[in-house]
Structures are given as C-alpha cells and as structure tokens.
C-alpha cells in the first residue's frame, strides 16, 4: 500500500470555528520532517493513531484544508469531521483521494 504524507492531529482539539489548530507537538514535528510550509488552501492528510477490534493499528485519517486564523495568528485545518475514518474503512475512491493508492 502506498502511503501519503500523514500529519499528526489531535482530533479532540478544535477552535471556535470548528477547525483543527495546527499547534500540537506531533503536528509541528511531522510538518518539519516533511519540509511542509503551510499556506492558505493547501490540502493535507491528517491522522490520529487508533486500533481495530483486534488491537491492530488502524489509524483514523481525514483530509483538511489549511486556513490562516488571523485572530490567533496561526494555521488551522478545516476538516469535515464526519469524514474521519479508519484506514481499513476507506472506500477505493477515498483511498485514491487521500493518496493511499
């Protein structure tokens, strides 16, 4: 399976506009390790570690669109929260869209 660049996200954090602020240490680390310079409108794939019912790793993933939060002077990802899925549950179309195929 081809793997896209995955950026860590703590899906429990969101700002007043229901966006994911890109401030977690894991997020900052992944952005730096992949030499990603954030910009408005950029699309990235975010993940959070998860497991299936047998204890096997099966991360949660979702696409986010980068926006600059002018009030807090930081970047945030606009995520469709209902689209968060375990990798094993992605349809073929979703796998292609997120870069897994």
What are these regions (language model features)?
Residues 48-54:
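Short, charged beta-turn/beta-strand-edge "cap" motif at the junction between a beta-strand
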Residues 23-36:
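Short alpha-helix capping/helix-loop boundary micro-motifs
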Residues 3, 59-61, 67-101:
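Glycine- and charge-enriched low-complexity intrinsically disordered segments
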Residues 6-26:
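Short, basic/aromatic beta-hairpin or loop at an interaction surface
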Residues 9, 63-64:
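Small-residue-enriched segments and motifs
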């Amino acid at each position: 399976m081809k793997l896209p660049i995955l950026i860590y996200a703590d899906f429990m954090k969101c700002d007043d506009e229901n966006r994911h602020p890109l401030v977690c240490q894991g997020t900052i680390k992944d952005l730096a390790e992949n030499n990603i310079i954030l910009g408005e409108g950029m699309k990235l794939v975010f993940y959070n570690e998860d497991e299936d019912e047998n204890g096997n790793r099966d991360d949660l993933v979702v696409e986010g669109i980068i926006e600059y939060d002018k009030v807090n002077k930081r970047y945030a990802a606009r995520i469709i929260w209902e689209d968060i899925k375990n990798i094993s549950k992605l349809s073929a179309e979703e796998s292609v869209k997120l870069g897994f195929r």
